[in-house]
């Protein structure tokens, strides 16, 4: 069984400014803006590939969203979610239930599964564990996470991968 760090999501006041800063520092580019985020989230995003992983820059588009409240509690921009890709979702789901970790959001289909775990139960960050058909492929279609030719935006001149995430509560 394996679990791979796929994506780090940031919550920020201004997604465009932070995406531009990431480009200036790391040479990475926005590959995708998800126009299909659930309205209940009240967020906009920018996805920037880092090799075969992503940095997702999220910012609130309206008042009183979970992301906006977290941004206010933090007192500024910061980490929001750690998103991992699993080779098998069922054992992770069983372990989460066994530990009594609250699941904030979940989706199970024949081609993709995800569960977002409550930050109070995971040390200060949303932890999302995903599985999809073709999970062993490091450069999959990611049809559930990103649409379009995102691979065309991979820039490895300054950074090639995300190797860790340090979580603060």
Segments predicted by a language model, with ranges:
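Short loop segments at secondary-structure junctions
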Residues: 52-53, 62, 87, 120-121
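Vicinal oxygen chelate
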Residues: 56, 93-159
